[in-house]
Design a protein with these regions (language model features):
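N-terminal leader/linker segments that initiate helical-solenoid repeat arrays
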Residues: 2-3, 19-83
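Terminal, low-structured helical/coil segments at or just beyond the last alpha-helical repeat
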Residues: 25-35, 62, 69, 73, ...
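Alpha-solenoid helical repeat scaffolds
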Residues: 48, 65-68, 103, 137, ...
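TPR-repeat structural position
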Residues: 57-60, 95, 129, 163
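Alpha-helical adaptor scaffolds
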Residues: 76-149
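Register position in tetratricopeptide repeats
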Residues: 91, 125, 159-160, 189-196
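Residue-level signature of tetratricopeptide-repeat
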Residues: 119-120, 153, 187
């Protein structure tokens, strides 16, 4: 049976039955108010448009890196500081400290996708796949085009043996970023694996 976190994920990405949208908990639905300011949103939207039109992987990778840098800023100095300290804690192998910081951050700014994506990373490093799924779902509820969260979800599904679901997630990422190398390589690998399995 599909686990609840995965079910919510697939609902958010349109990969499960249409009725699932009504079944998702309110906390997993997209927020009505964006976290970032209008100027940052406009810059990100422009980068996403360029990403969709990128002609080669090198261009796409560069644009994704710029989007990642934008995603690191919430519009709140306190939020940005908590995220930075959590990243430093992870780099120092202090995952529990990072989780505590990210707990505080997600409570402070529950609409910031990057905070949930960072907490999902800490969950994964702490050996908690269920929490990883839940926090990635929240990241994607806040920002369905968060490429890092999509890539992490695809990898998690692939690691758990859900190749078909993982492929659909990577294909969704490629709809946003057709030339993005990590998603394209993962999708190609999974298509080959699934084709070999079906022979």
């Amino acid at each position: 049976m599909m686990g609840r976190p995965l079910f919510v994920f697939l609902c958010l990405l349109g990969l499960a039955v249409p009725a699932c949208a009504a079944d998702a908990p309110m906390s997993s639905r997209p927020p009505s108010t964006p976290q970032a300011d209008g100027g940052q949103d406009a810059g990100r939207d422009a980068l996403l448009a360029r990403l969709a039109a990128a002609v080669d992987p090198e261009e796409a990778d560069g644009i994704v890196a710029r989007i990642d840098r934008l995603n690191q800023h919430s519009g709140s100095d306190t939020g940005d500081l908590l995220l930075s300290r959590a990243a430093a804690a992870i780099d120092g192998d202090r995952v529990e400290v990072a989780r505590q910081l990210l707990d505080a951050l997600t409570a402070l700014q529950p609409q910031w996708a990057e905070a949930w994506a960072a907490r999902a990373n800490a969950d994964y490093l702490d050996g908690d796949p269920k929490a990883t799924f839940v926090d990635l779902a929240r990241a994607l509820a806040a920002d369905p085009k968060h490429l890092k969260a999509l890539a992490d979800l695809g990898a998690l599904l692939e690691d758990s043996g859900r190749r078909d679901d993982a492929l659909r997630v990577y294909q969704h990422a490629l709809e946003i970023a057709p030339q993005w190398r990590p998603a394209r390589e993962a999708a190609d690998r999974l298509r080959a694996a699934i084709a070999g399995q079906d022979l």
